[in-house]
Each structure stands twice: as C-alpha cells, then as structure tokens.
C-alpha cells in the first residue's frame, strides 16, 4: 500500500480472500474523494455498469501498486532479477509479467481505496496542470521511467 492511499480496516483481508490458485495479483480500485475511479484505474470507469454487479473482475490491463497484493505464486514464478535497473517504476512491467506467466490479475471494484495521485511526488502533478513542463522535466531530467 503506497503512502498516498487510505484503506479501510478490512481492505487487505478482502484482498487476501480473493487469492486462490492461478491468481497473480489482486488490486483494489482507487477512487478520489467523490468516489470516482481515478488514476491509474480510469480505464475501469464504465465497467461497473457493464458487469452486472460483479465486485471483482479478471483483467489483463495494467495494475498500479497503489494498493496491490502480489501472490506467493507470482513471487515464485517471476524472475525479478530481469527488472530493468534503469527504470523507476515496475508496476506495469510486473502486472504484464503476471499475465504472461499465465496468472490471473483481479481488480476489486467493490473494495475501493482513497488515492491522492502523486502526493509523494508533487512534480508529477504538473502532468495535469502544466503538461509541457511535466514532459520537459520528465525527458530532460530522465524522471519517471516506466
């Protein structure tokens, strides 16, 4: 659980309850203070209306490590020595590895956590307020390699 995330007292227990054979990762969807899905799960915004009330769904989409459980099965199957040391973030890489290894990644829509994007890295908020400045810093200072 990242520092910019607020969880409920039962969040992690609910996530652990989803772990079964063949599951690589379990993530809690992130929401803003109004309860709207936010970064990095914008892609799931319309899902709750199409899923007939399902609270947890299997997806091949990328996960963030905002509030994500990596299962023992994934930890044993993945070779973390292969991670590129020049990168800053590995959540996208590892979530893709999980799928590539034949594991299922579960996104819990019914177990949301409050997320304040980039609270620990204020310069990243420039992406939304001053995108040109953000990308200039990202590329010239070689920041935020995914």
Where are these regions (language model features)?
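Catalytic core of nucleotide-sugar-dependent glycosyltransferases
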Residues: 123-146
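A recurrent flexible, glycine/aromatic-enriched loop bordering the glycosyltransferase active site
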Residues: 50-72
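A conserved hydrophobic position in a structured secondary element of the catalytic/binding core
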Residues: 7, 70, 75, 108
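The conserved acidic donor/metal-binding loop of glycosyltransferases
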Residues: 2-6
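Conserved donor-nucleotide/metal-binding helix-loop-beta segment in metal-dependent transferases, i.e.
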Residues: 10-28
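Donor nucleotide-sugar recognition loop
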Residues: 65, 77-96, 100, 105-107, ...
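Short beta-strand-to-loop element that shapes/binds the nucleotide-sugar donor at the catalytic cleft/hinge
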Residues: 26-42
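Active-site donor/metal-binding and catalytic loop motifs
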Residues: 106-126
């Amino acid at each position: 659980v990242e520092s910019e995330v607020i969880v409920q007292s039962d969040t992690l227990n609910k996530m652990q309850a989803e772990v079964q054979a063949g599951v690589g990762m379990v993530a809690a969807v992130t929401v803003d203070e109004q309860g709207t899905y936010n970064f990095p799960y914008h892609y799931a915004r319309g899902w709750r209306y199409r899923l007939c009330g399902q609270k947890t769904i299997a997806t091949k989409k990328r996960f963030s490590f905002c509030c994500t459980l990596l299962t023992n099965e994934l930890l044993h199957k993945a070779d973390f020595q292969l991670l590129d040391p020049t990168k800053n973030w590995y959540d996208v890489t590892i979530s893709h590895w999980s799928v590539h290894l034949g594991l299922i990644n579960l996104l819990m829509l019914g177990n949301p956590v409050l997320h304040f994007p980039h609270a620990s890295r204020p310069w990243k908020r420039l992406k939304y307020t001053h995108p040109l400045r953000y990308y200039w810093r990202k590329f010239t200072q070689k920041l935020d390699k995914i």
